[in-house]
Structure formats: structure tokens, C-alpha cells
From Swiss-Prot:
Coiled coil: none annotated. It is found in: Cytoplasm. Its main location: cytoplasm. The keyword Isomerase applies. PANTHER family: 60 KDA HEAT SHOCK PROTEIN, MITOCHONDRIAL (PTHR45633). This is Chaperonin GroEL. HAMAP family: CH60. It is an enzyme of class 5 (isomerase).
Length: 549
């Protein structure tokens, strides 16, 4: 491989090429009348999806420079997806349009730094306007919750109503997870006991689902301890028993490091042991209580600690906890329990309620209520079915997007949907003046780009956007939308065409962030195959093995 430095108009042209690819490929999935995209896989059949994030990740241009730029676009989608799990298509539309407009101005000789400063100045004003437009969503108004989910699920009422039903059952503090159903073609909601806490996997090598970057273990044992584990010897007897059982193991400990962690990772990679490890939640006495909560929920006989005098070497499978399912992300762990009618769980809940009543500290009461909510709130499992594997995966993507959107709406409220929130917010830029001509260009770019999402939604419906946008603006009603599904003008909240304010905010913020970086990029260094490597079956740096791991 050799390095090539690309700059000037050649780089700007590449920016525009990739932005056009994104705008024509990712953007066509937007809205209830958006289209699906097929993504070829190295193995198996192509995946058919309307998930903008998946489509963006699937774009891999042949030219090395364009491929490098596309990966930066994909990172912007990834950031948006990580923060709210939705809004990636809107983010892609905004980013690509900002890049195209800014690149044209830079090619015309305008100062890129001044343009970026104008974009940043406009961003701050728009974010305040989005916040002022937001309306709080109440869990009592279950129809509003359903509408948020329906919109994000591309108009699927079954998905929206199922998510609303789940939220109603588990409440604001409850946990909702998604899994694929075996044998069913329907979307089902199953209520079970469980809990979620804010600790993720200790090593990415524990990941079982590389596409979603999560650990998913069915019917695992749970070893729960207050101790810090750094040597493997005390764990060997129970690990051998786990291997013989054929079931996975989840270890929750104060910390796991050194030899203990590396041995678990190596055995997991070799396929001999299905295992994952996470740090215990909380701190101090609160950590001890939360570990006891988890032990009660999973039916573990002990939380292993020095005071008990129980040695790790003497543990048997009967001493461990069990769960129906454990899902671990980089930030959270969700335990779905099989102990739904356990007397010990009920007794634990009553004990915490009693502590809340007798506590005189507001802080302690708050933490006790958090524990009570985790233990009693339950877990709603959305089981996604379908006639084929392709249908199940496509539907699961939409269910997860809708679930993330619903959570975001509960957090920061809702705004009119159908792309009008950004369109109406752009009006505040009429009074914003830049300190220079270039700054004003940046402000004008944002004003123009904020109409891109609604233009694309209308275009995907086969309609002319200019006429519709002109009518909406002239009515001077910030709750008026064009419903591309019903093909009529309507009040956003009456028609249920609403978006989570947080999703709109994050999509816009992320797009501005990525566009600002690319706008101020003068040169890029890219790797291209050298002449010797062009005839080689393997590119430079490729090896036939794993490097002797």
C-alpha cells in the first residue's frame, strides 16, 4: 500500500460525490413512503432493510478516497445511533446536504473557517428553538406514546401499539427488550421480572452479536460476588462445572482484571466457554444492597463475600443464580429473570418499601426508590416474529428504532413531525446576522438545509415539495404538518405525526459536528494499492492466519 495526499478541488469533488450517494441511497428510506434497500452480504442472502443506519454502514465506494469519506459519514450515523438509537436517516440527510452546500461555497473561493463559524452560530440558535417547541409527553396519554412509536416504525401501528402497551405495563422505570420469536409470525409482548443496571461488559471480546455490539446469553448461570477477581485459580472448579453443563455464565464482581479476565476472554474466543463479565453496580453499601437484589431476583444462594467464609473453590451450580436471558451493552446490563413468582423477591420488595417509610434521609429514600423500581418494575419483552428470517430481521430493526424513539420522547418531549420541526425552527435564522460574509454563508446553509428532511419525505411520497413547503410556511402555524401517508394537511398532535425532540436535536447536532469537521478539512491522506499489490491476491498487510493470538 502507498499513501496519496488529496486536496483542493479533487477533495471537494469527492465530498460532493459521497454526499450525493448518501442522499440518494440512505435518504430514500425516510418516512412511511420510503423505500427499502438491499445490502449484499459476504455470506448468505442480501439483507432488505429500511434502517438508515444499516444502509449507511453498507455504503462502501470503490475509490479509496470516497470509501474513507463514507466511513466518516457512517461514524456520524453511529454517534446518533449510540445516543438515541434513532434519527440516523435524518442525520444522514442533514449531513449530506450541509456538505454539498458548503463544498460549493468553498469551491467558489469562500473561507471555510468563516463558513464553519456561521454554521456553529446558527446551530446554537436552532437548538434553543427546538427546545422551545417541545411538548412534554405523559405516560397517561398512551395514544401519544403509541404515535411516537408508529412514526419511527414507518407507520406500523402494530409495532406502535405493542410498544405503548409495554410502556404502560412496566412504567417509566421499567425495562423493555427486543428479541426474535421462535415459531410465531406475530409481534407479542411478554411481561416478566427482571432488572437493568448501568454497567457494561468488561471486555468487547465477550460480545456475541458483532453487528449490534452486544452480549446476548440465553439461560445463563450468574456468579455474584463483592470481591475483586484477579487470579483464575479459585474460579477453575466452577468454570469446569459450567463447561460440562453447556450453559453460559455471567460473572458480576467488584472488578475482574489481570489473569482472571484474560483467561475468561481466551476461553470465550476459543469457544470452550460461553462467558461474560461485568462490574457490580453502585458504590459502597449501596453496591452491596444492589448485589443482594440481583441475587434475590436470580435465585442465587449467596453473594460471595469475605464475611460469609464461603470459598469460591467450593461453589456448585446450585449456589449460582439463573436467568432466562441476559443482555449486555457497553453501558448497561439487563437481566430477565425466571423467578417471577418467587416469595424471596416479594419479601425483598416489602423490605425495601419498609426502609423507604422509616428512612429520614431524602437521598437514601431516592436511592431506595430506584432499587424498588428496578426490582418491581419488571421487564417487557417484545417478541418479533415473521414468515421468513429476512422479514423478522427487518421488522426487528423497526421495533428497536421505535423503542428508542419512544424512550427519547419520554425524556425530552415531542415536537411536530414530518420534518416540519426543523423547517419551522429555521425561521429564527432570518434575524441572525454573521460577523462576516462567510459567516452569513454558513448561516444561510443551515437555513436551506433544515428544509431537506421534509423535502425528502415529500419526494419519497412522489409529490412536489416546493408547493407544500410554501403553503406550510404561509399558514404561520407551527403545529401544521403535511401527512405524507394520508396525503393531507393536518395538526401534528391531532394526526399523531410527532417526533421526539431529543431525536431531532441529536440528529441535527451530530450532522453539524461531522459537517464542521469535513468543511475545515483541506487534505486527506488515503491508502491506495501499490503496483506490486495490485497483482497479489492479498493486499498489503493481509495475513493468512490470526497472527498467532
Amino acid at each position: 500500500m502507498t499513501n496519496v495526499v488529496v486536496s483542493g478541488e479533487q477533495l471537494q469533488e469527492a465530498f460532493r460525490e459521497v454526499a450525493a450517494i448518501v442522499d440518494s441511497t440512505v435518504a430514500i428510506t425516510a418516512g412511511p413512503r420510503g423505500k427499502t434497500v438491499g445490502i449484499n452480504k459476504p455470506y448468505g442472502a442480501p439483507e432488505i432493510t429500511k434502517d438508515g443506519y444499516k444502509v449507511m454502514k453498507g455504503i462502501k465506494p470503490e475509490k479509496p478516497l470516497n470509501a474513507a469519506i463514507a466511513s466518516i459519514f457512517a461514524q456520524s450515523c453511529s454517534q446518533c445511533n449510540d445516543k438515541v438509537g434513532d434519527g440516523t436517516t435524518t442525520c444522514s440527510i442533514l449531513t449530506s446536504n450541509m456538505i454539498m452546500e458548503a463544498s460549493k461555497s468553498i469551491a467558489a473561493g469562500n473561507d471555510r473557517v468563516g463558513i464553519k463559524n456561521g454554521i456553529q452560530k446558527a446551530k446554537d440558535v436552532i437548538l434553543k428553538e427546538i427546545a422551545s417547541m417541545s411538548r412534554t409527553i405523559s405516560l397517561e396519554k398512551i395514544d401519544e406514546v403509541a404515535q411516537v412509536a408508529i412514526i419511527s416504525a414507518n407507520g406500523d401501528k402494530d409495532i406502535g401499539n405493542s410498544i405503548a402497551d409495554s410502556v404502560k405495563k412496566v412504567g417509566k422505570e421499567g425495562v423493555i427488550t427486543v428479541e426474535e420469536s421462535k415459531g410465531s409470525k406475530e409481534l407479542e409482548v411478554e411481561l416478566t421480572t427482571g432488572m437493568q443496571f448501568d454497567r457494561g461488559y468488561l471486555s468487547p471480546y465477550f460480545i456475541t452479536n458483532n453487528e449490534k455490539m452486544i452480549v446476548e446469553l440465553d439461560n445463563p448461570y450468574l456468579l455474584i460476588t463483592e470481591k475483586k477477581l484477579n487470579i483464575i485459580q479459585p474460579l477453575l472448579p466452577i468454570l469446569e462445572a459450567i463447561v460440562k453443563s453447556g450453559k453460559p455464565l455471567v460473572i458480576i464482581a467488584e472488578d475482574i482484571e489481570g489473569e482472571a479476565l484474560s483467561t475468561l476472554v481466551i476461553n470465550k474466543l476459543r469457544g470452550g466457554l460461553k462467558v461474560a463479565a461485568v462490574k457490580a453496580p453502585g458504590f459502597g453499601d449501596r453496591r452491596k444492597e444492589m448485589l443482594e437484589d440481583i441475587a434475590t431476583l436470580t435465585g442465587a444462594k449467596y453473594v460471595i463475600k469475605d464475611e460469609l467464609g464461603i470459598k469460591m473453590e467450593d461453589l456448585t451450580l446450585d449456589d449460582l443464580g439463573t436467568a432466562k436471558n441476559v443482555k449486555i451493552t457497553k453501558d448497561n446490563t439487563t437481566v430477565v429473570s425466571e423467578n417471577s413468582d418467587s416469595d424471596s423477591v416479594k419479601a425483598r420488595i416489602e423490605q425495601i418499601k419498609s426502609q423507604i417509610e422509616t428512612s429520614t434521609s431524602d437521598y437514601d429514600k431516592e436511592k431506595l426508590r430506584e432499587r424498588l423500581a428496578k426490582l418491581s418494575g419488571g421487564v417487557a419483552v417484545l417478541k418479533v416474529g415473521g414468515a421468513t428470517e429476512v422479514e423478522v430481521k427487518e421488522r426487528r430493526d423497526r421495533v428497536e428504532d421505535a423503542l428508542h424513539a419512544t424512550r427519547a420522547a419520554i425524556e425530552e418531549g415531542i415536537v411536530p413531525g414530518g420534518g416540519v420541526a426543523l423547517l419551522y425552527a429555521s425561521s429564527v435564522l432570518d434575524k441572525l446576522k454573521g460577523a462576516s460574509d462567510e459567516e452569513q454563508i454558513g448561516i444561510n446553509i443551515i437555513k436551506k438545509v433544515l428544509s431537506a428532511p421534509i423535502r425528502r419525505l415529500v419526494k419519497n411520497a412522489g409529490l412536489e415539495s416546493a408547493v407544500i413547503i410554501d403553503y406550510l410556511i404561509k399558514q404561520n402555524d407551527k403545529e401544521l404538518i403535511y401527512n405524507v401517508e394520508a396525503m393531507n394537511y393536518a395538526n401534528a398532535f391531532t394526526a399523531g405525526v410527532i417526533d421526539p425532540a431529543k431525536v431531532v436535536r441529536i440528529a441535527f447536532e451530530t450532522a453539524v459536528s461531522v459537517a464542521s469537521v469535513l468543511i475545515t478539512t483541506e487534505s486527506m491522506i488515503v491508502d491506495v494499492p501499490s503496483k506490486e499489490n495490485a497483482s497479489s491476491p492479498m493486499g498489503a498487510g493481509e495475513m493468512s492466519g490470526m497472527g498467532g493470538f
